[in-house]
Every structure is written in C-alpha cells, then in structure tokens.
Amino acid sequence: MVVANIMTPEVVTVDPASSIGTAIALMREHGFRRLPVVKEGKLVGIVTDRDLRQATNSPLVLRERWYSDFLLEAIKVKSCMTPDPITATPATPIIDAARRLRQHKIGGLPVVAADDDRRVVGMVTITDMLDCLIHLLASEDPID
C-alpha cells in the first residue's frame, strides 16, 4: 500500500507571509494541527499548532489581551514554521512514511507531487495510518 491510499487530498495551506492569527484561524476552522506553508504553489515549510503556541508564549500575550491580538497579526508564519519539511509522495510506501514519522518524531507529512516540483497534493498523518491499521486488522480485505 502507498500513501495515496490513505492521504487526505484536500489540503489547506498557508502563505509564509500570513499572520499566525490567520494560521490559527485556519487550523480551528478545519480541525487540523498542522498546515503546509506554500509560496507560489511550492512547499516551503510546515507550521504546527505547537509552533504557534510557542510563538505566542510570552508573558505579555498571557497578560495583555490587546498585545495578544497585536502579536497574532504582527508575527508571520515564516518566523515560526519549519522550513523544508520531511515529505512523502503519493507513491511512497506507507511503511516508509510511517518510519519517517517515527524517526523524526512528527505527526504528519505533506505529500508532494512525484515530479519533484514541491506542489502539495495531500497530507498523511499518524491518524491516517492508525485508521489504515484498524481497517486492516478488522477486515480480510485490505485497502486498495
């Protein structure tokens, strides 16, 4: 089985010049914990809910609401994202993707087009892999 069988193809992305407030709003709206960061159609990074919490972990943010709102708009995604993230392609075997997640202690991989243009075509997460495992253990028929 390959990543294409279990990935989420509908990807919500964020621009590196967007505010972290925008990234937080997108994560909340769509229920995601990570967003690929895309500039001019190409993957340049990934930002997670943890990155955003760390970026706003300031005594002023916790104490002063007005300053918190200011920071959410002033701080840009590019300042807290992880550049050049570990990726997979749709043809990557699921076992290889799982090993990457485990080795790098991360929760998800952007899935990029196989032609190496860094165009994001999906996301695959630990949850996707657990769903696959549950399906395989619960049935005789593996996912196509």
Outline where the language-model segments fall.
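Tandem CBS (Bateman) regulatory domains
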Residues: 1-10, 48-86, 98-102, 120, ...
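A cytosolic small-molecule/anion-sensing beta-strand core signal
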Residues: 7, 39, 81, 113-116
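The conserved cystathionine-beta-synthase
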Residues: 14-31, 37-39, 87-106, 112-114, ...
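Hydrophobic alpha-helical segments, especially transmembrane helices
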Residues: 34-35, 51
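Short hydrophobic beta-strand segments in globular cytosolic domains
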Residues: 38, 44, 120-121
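Short active-site-proximal "capping" loops at secondary-structure junctions
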Residues: 42-43, 54
